Amino acid sequence: MTLKWTSVLLLIHLSCYFSSGSCGKVLVWAAEYSHWMNMKTILKELVQRGHEVTVLASSASILFDPNDASTLKFEVYPTSLTKTEFENIIMQQVKRWSDIRKDSFWLYFSQEQEILWELYDIFRNFCKDVVSNKKVMKKLQESRFDIVFADAVFPCGELLAALLNIRFVYSLRFTPGYTIERHSGGLIFPPSYIPIVMSKLSDQMTFMERVKNMIYVLYFDFWFQMSDMKKWDQFYSEVLGRPTTLFETMGKADIWLMRNSWSFQFPHPFLPNVDFVGGFHCKPAKPLPKEMEEFVQSSGENGVVVFSLGSVISNMTAERANVIATALAKIPQKVLWRFDGNKPDALGLNTRLYKWIPQNDLLGHPKTRAFITHGGANGIYEAIYHGIPMVGIPLFFDQPDNIAHMKAKGAAVRLDFNTMSSTDLLNALKTVINDPLYKENIMKLSRIQHDQPVKPLDRAVFWIEFVMPHKGAKHLRVAAHDLTWFQYHSLDVIGFLLACVATVIFIITKFCLFCFWKFARKGKKGKRD
């Protein structure tokens, strides 16, 4: 071992003794795509603070290579799917998702449920592969981890925590209908003023919108399921050797790190073991690559527009690409378009195509005037952080809801990807660039995001570090988790009080009838006399 690495290891060990906390061993149940990108930001910060982080991932994991040099440790377990097969399945499901007609409530959510069930069948198989692998489980037991860190959208982290008898912390953006947040996290979302996620409503609802919101709540409560819950409940019961459910196991999480922020989310109640850490991945812009910087500078006073539909959508039809290219060619700004496909015929001289762009650095550039986005949460937080108004072209899942939030806050214009014309896109860009109100509104949100007593990333890491030495955070866990559904809604108390009232009414009624009978009998007797 070189002197350099010996010094590094010595410094890490010393930091364990002289820092405010102690170094811990963190086991991570790996997520995919943007979920993994968010987790990785927190994990890197944990490593910098001297903690040992081990990522448990399947051999089919998409976004990272365990063989790459990294400060993270990887424990890879074999699974039946290959990386290519898993990626192809994800891409097929994303395409199905994007193609669902959004004008029909029942059709949209029934097909969305079908897609989610197929994906969660794969996730359950991944979970089975790891808990049934005696070699891997023995190694995990012997490693004596202090905590499990997982994304609640990808179940199994909580099962591993139960098997290893350690505490766990969740990272979560949201689940459809706030299902997991309500049933496992105990969070409260009054439908009278909190729009259910994926409803595309704001918190300023009319009467009919509140009716619509209530219908959404009932639908997600009694009909929609993210996965086949019976299979998950049976699987968890078999593994743990006692009757249990997925929601019950997830409900034992010590801390919920919600990737939300009051600059983005509508105000609503939340619990002591929940913290909003949305935007923790945002950071000041770094210098752009030389060629890209020269192109940006060539825009002069007009500035540039950044355009990205995310990493999952890798291609689009030639017709849609040309509709977009035609609109972009007519604006005075230069355009940097993340696009992985054939060059559109209508592409203007002011537009350059890139397979990848440093999105955060571009949004933080002083010449950036607008951001055309699909509405992914990470991109929206970066736009808020840097104060860039948006044109939203949502595609699927939470994206329409995210753009609805930004539109309600006056920071974005929304378009429909499948029906928008070149004129629609052109007018939307002119609106967010030339109307100063959009810039003012996004700057208000940016100041809110920046003006926090503790940075979101520091808070996220703090709670993970807090749970390890304290062996949990039971003092923050509300007693609602220990109640049955009828106790939670006080139905037993209401029933008891109604029974008491009914008993009193019954006794009073009987007493009155008895008195009436007595007086009537006395009256008849007096008449006979």
Curated annotation (Swiss-Prot):
- Return the broad EC class: transferase
Q: Which GO terms describe its biological process?
A: estrogen metabolic process; xenobiotic metabolic process
Report where it is expressed, by tissue.
Widely expressed.
Q: What keywords does the record list, in alphabetical order?
A: Endoplasmic reticulum, Glycoprotein, Glycosyltransferase, Membrane, Microsome, Signal, Transferase, Transmembrane, Transmembrane helix
CC terms in the record's Gene Ontology section = endoplasmic reticulum membrane
Entry GO MF terms = glucuronosyltransferase activity
Transmembrane ranges?
493-513
**Is Secreted a UniProt keyword of this protein?**
no
What InterPro entries does UniProt report for this protein, alphabetically? UDP-glycosyltransferase (IPR050271), UDP_glucos_trans (IPR002213), UDP_glycos_trans_CS (IPR035595)
| Catalysed reaction, written as an equation | glucuronate acceptor + UDP-alpha-D-glucuronate = acceptor beta-D-glucuronoside + UDP + H(+)
Predominant cellular place of this UniProt entry's protein? membrane
The protein's matches in Gene3D superfamilies, at most eight in alphabetical order, are given as:
Glycogen Phosphorylase B (3.40.50.2000)
Tell me how this protein sits in the membrane. Answer: Single-pass membrane protein
Against PROSITE patterns, the record matches this protein to: UDPGT
Q: Which residues does the record list as glycosylated?
A: 315
Entry keyword annotation includes Transferase: yes
N6-succinyllysine occurs at 135
What protein family is recorded? Belongs to the UDP-glycosyltransferase family.
Q: What is this protein called?
A: UDP-glucuronosyltransferase 2B11
